């Protein structure tokens, strides 16, 4: 399984003899640090990249902080929020990589089904040299230890506080970003395939 480790426990209850927890990963040819001629500093801003849905709209409206949003479908928002700067449309791999590399924070909004597990952005953001800010849960903390490879939050109050903390301490944020970019290499889909084959053959 890849969606959540909890599925493995359910499979065991169903007496499935062999099951393997294989989390998502990243494509090393697509999700990579951009090849920039000049070294750039982060822009002291926050981004979220992803397709529009009502849950994400409500999340960002409730958070109510300045954030740049990229992805298809965001022109569907009926009520405009002055703090949400929208660039609606598809994002190619090169632009996606530049966004994650340039911004001080890349926010990962976990959907309801992911709240206690992980999603693709858990790996893709650090692979592109982004600084991952994601919801706190055991599964993600096992993959990327909090305050070592990423930042985590529990609720809106802590999320706002954590954003201020990250922007105020760029030195620590830079260390965490670099450590995560190195750590994530073991989670490429190439390595996932090697692991799977070693357990099946």
Regions found by a protein language model. Name each.
Residues 58-65, 153, 184, 199-201:
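Alpha-helix C-terminal capping segments
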Residues 168-200:
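A charged, aromatic-enriched C-terminal amphipathic alpha-helix characteristic of glycosyltransferases
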Residues 125, 150, 180:
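Hydrophobic, well-ordered secondary-structure elements that form the walls
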Residues 7, 121, 162, 179-180:
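Short, hydrophobic/aromatic alpha-helical segments in well-folded domains
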Residues 156-159, 176:
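Catalytic phosphate/metal-binding cores of nucleic-acid and nucleotide-processing enzymes, i.e., regions
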Residues 1-146, 195:
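Nucleotide-sugar donor-binding catalytic core of glycosyltransferases
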């Amino acid at each position: 399984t890849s969606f959540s480790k909890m599925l493995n426990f359910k499979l065991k209850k169903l007496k499935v003899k062999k099951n393997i927890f294989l989390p998502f990963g990243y494509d090393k040819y697509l999700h990579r640090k951009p090849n920039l001629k000049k070294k750039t500093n982060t822009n002291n801003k926050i981004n979220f990249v992803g397709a529009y849905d009502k849950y994400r709209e409500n999340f960002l409206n409730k958070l109510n902080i300045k954030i740049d949003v990229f992805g298809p479908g965001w022109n569907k928002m009926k009520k405009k929020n002055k703090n949400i700067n929208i660039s609606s449309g598809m994002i190619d791999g090169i632009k996606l990589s530049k966004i994650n590399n340039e911004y001080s924070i890349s926010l990962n909004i976990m959907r309801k089904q992911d709240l206690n597990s992980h999603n693709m952005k858990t790996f893709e953001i650090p692979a592109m040299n982004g600084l991952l800010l994601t919801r706190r849960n055991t599964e993600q903390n096992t993959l990327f230890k909090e305050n070592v490879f990423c930042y985590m939050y529990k609720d809106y109050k802590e999320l706002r506080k954590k954003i201020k903390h990250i922007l105020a301490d760029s030195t620590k944020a830079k260390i965490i970003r670099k450590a995560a970019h190195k750590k994530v290499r073991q989670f490429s889909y190439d390595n996932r395939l090697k692991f799977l084959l070693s357990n099946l053959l």
